[in-house]
Amino acid sequence: MSRNRLHLTVAAVIYYQGRFLLVQERDKLSGREVLNQPAGHMEEDEDLLSAVCREVYEETGLTLLPSAWLGISQLKASNGHTYVRVNFLFEPDQLPAAFQPQDPDILALHWLDKSQLLAQKLPPRSQLVLDAIDLCLAGTRLPLSLIQPLC
């Protein structure tokens, strides 16, 4: 019997004029190319907001601040691991002129609305991607003040 591992991750839903910024990357388990929000694991010395801003910078080259908290999603993956994902909303005032991902694992970036995402040959990395988009489209906007550092 394998032991369940818990992963705390953060994700950035970057939303501009009805479209979402998605990164194209290779899923490390399956090897297939997928679409995801800029997302990743928190590091030990980070709080949630610092972690999500770092992920945005690493995966897009953009320096942005979140406008709202979208909530928490959870997924039990096929590898037996549980992923707890803290979703944040970023709403830039203007379309960025260029992207310069710092992470070599990012293959491309795409601005897509939900219908375009669903029509893509590249699948979302997991249901968590669609869940975060649905939270945004449903109007979920939780205040960032609800996220308090523990120390």
Kindly label every feature range from the protein language model.
Residues 42-65, 75-126, 149-151:
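Unchanged
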Residues 1-21, 38-41, 72:
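Conserved N-terminal beta-strand and adjoining loop/helix that marks the start
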Residues 9-11, 63-66:
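Conserved beta-strand residues within beta-sheet cores
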Residues 16-58:
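Conserved Nudix-box catalytic region and its N-terminal flanking loop in Nudix hydrolases
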Residues 67-71:
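Conserved S-adenosyl-L-methionine
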Residues 130-151:
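Charged phosphate-binding loop/patch that engages nucleotide di/tri-phosphates or the phosphate backbone
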